[in-house]
């Protein structure tokens, strides 16, 4: 696997979480937020999230899909990793294939990160940036979508998309969806939920708008969705001396019909946490008291979840599995992941991993359908040799990220017994 996993962002957001006790049942309809759909048949209440923003792998519960640079041509080769054995192979069924160039069945004319989106019926939807002529300033970057089966055979060939998607993807098993944000000069955002057709008879790859919102300046989507809509956080700036910090004010649900419902309200020193991966949930953390509470998304009511040391500040990176929450904090300028179980004592994860010569905590990157975790185990550095375009033999040092699979309980104990996935270097 190519090294694509950069440093998980650990800059302090001074996220100050929302009041855990506020119960709000009214629905506030805001005149500047409107939803509209050009796809009457789209059932947005059945959407499930397929990937998170920035995810560098795609999972169907048993398989990890990834790409590597084609050794002897441009483009990338699609690979799979068995999440029960750790073994890696090219997604190619051609007998005798050496998996080197565009003749390989796993080859993609791809020049940017790829999203591999597994459907429940076994189809794989591939969305990726494509090579093309130099773009004019302000023009959309090239992108394509194609459909394959689990053997790698092409069901629908690469079809151009009107613009290059980014962020999370969703599906109702009929189409795939993604969010497209267009920022305005006043800081507000026009947000479209774009639907990509998967039925060849209806025009595979055809893009349309399934929903549209005009969001005010200080209302930000989290990309996590429920049956009713997208979770969002309303925030504001405040000053602490000469420092401008972000203060959370409301946890909201931007509903599919365009209305916005307030789930809970914030007090000073509190912040909302909507886990990046795993179960759809919301938590409230009070940095002054160290109290973590879980919020009921339907009523806004809260229940105590865990107690942490005072003075911690939430930062990015979190996962929820049942009654277990794994999240990252900053304390005295250092990043510290914690394992929290409802009603139990918090456990600081002390395992360190090396990235580019720097140590940092072992981070949870994703949650499998069976509740196991994908964990960043640090970098593997090695030498690689190849012949360049002039015929010269080149040797250089490179690295790729080691990934492990473990249960939440194994992670709590330092992930020493995790399954290490085979690297591309060993493949």
Tell where the protein language model's regions lie, with residue ranges:
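Bacterial N-terminal signal peptides that target proteins for export
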Residues: 1-9
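C-terminal motif of bacterial Sec signal peptides marking the signal peptidase cleavage site
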Residues: 16-19
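Bacterial signal peptide processing site
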Residues: 21-23
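N-terminal export/targeting and maturation segments
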Residues: 35-74, 274
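Repeated scaffold domains used in trafficking and secretory/extracellular systems
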Residues: 49-59, 100-118, 162-173, 214-227, ...
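Residue position within the beta-strands of beta-propeller blades
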Residues: 65-67, 125-128, 177-180, 232-234, ...
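Residue-level signature of beta-propeller blades and closely related beta-rich strand-turn architectures
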Residues: 70, 130-132, 182, 236-237, ...
């Amino acid at each position: 696997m190519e090294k694509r996993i950069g440093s998980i962002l650990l800059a302090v957001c001074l996220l100050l979480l929302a009041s855990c006790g506020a119960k709000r049942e009214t629905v506030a309809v805001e005149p500047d937020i409107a939803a509209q759909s050009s796809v009457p048949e789209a059932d947005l209440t059945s959407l499930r999230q397929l990937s998170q923003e920035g995810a560098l792998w795609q999972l169907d519960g048993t398989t990890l899909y990834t790409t590597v640079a084609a050794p002897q041509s441009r483009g990338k080769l699609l690979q799979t990793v068995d999440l029960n054995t750790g073994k890696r192979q090219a997604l190619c069924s051609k007998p005798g294939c050496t998996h080197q160039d565009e003749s390989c069945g796993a080859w993609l004319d791809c020049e940017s990160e790829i999203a591999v989106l597994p459907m429940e019926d076994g189809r794989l939807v591939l969305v990726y940036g494509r090579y093309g002529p130099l773009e004019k300033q302000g023009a959309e970057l090239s992108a394509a979508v194609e459909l394959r089966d689990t053997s790698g055979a092409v069901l629908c060939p690469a079809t151009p998309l009107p613009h290059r998607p980014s962020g999370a993807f969703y599906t109702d098993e009929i189409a795939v969806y993604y969010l497209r944000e267009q920022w305005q000069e006043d800081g507000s955002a026009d947000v479209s939920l774009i639907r990509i057709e998967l039925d060849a008879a209806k025009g595979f790859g055809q893009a349309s708008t399934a929903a549209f919102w005009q969001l005010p300046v200080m209302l930000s989507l989290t990309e996590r969705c429920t049956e009713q809509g997208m979770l969002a956080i309303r925030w504001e700036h405040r000053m602490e001396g000469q420092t401008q910090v972000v203060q959370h004010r409301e946890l909201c649900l931007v509903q599919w019909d365009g209305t916005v419902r307030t789930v809970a309200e914030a007090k000073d020193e509190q912040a909302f946490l909507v886990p990046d991966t795993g179960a759809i949930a919301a938590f409230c953390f009070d940095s002054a008291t160290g109290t973590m509470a879980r919020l009921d998304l339907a009523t806004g009511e809260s229940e105590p979840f865990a107690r942490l040391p005072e003075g911690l500040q939430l930062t990015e990176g979190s996962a929820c599995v049942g009654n277990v929450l794994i999240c990252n904090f900053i304390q005295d300028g250092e990043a510290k992941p914690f394992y929290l179980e409802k009603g139990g004592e918090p456990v600081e994860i002390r395992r360190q991993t090396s990235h580019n010569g720097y140590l940092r905590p072992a981070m949870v990157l994703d949650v499998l359908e069976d509740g196991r975790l994908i964990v960043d185990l640090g970098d593997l550095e090695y030498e690689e040799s190849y012949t360049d375009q002039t015929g010269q033999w080149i040797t250089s040092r490179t690295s790729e990220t080691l990934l492990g699979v473990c249960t939440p309980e194994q992670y709590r104990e330092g992930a020493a017994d995790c399954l290490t996935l085979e690297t591309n270097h060993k493949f």
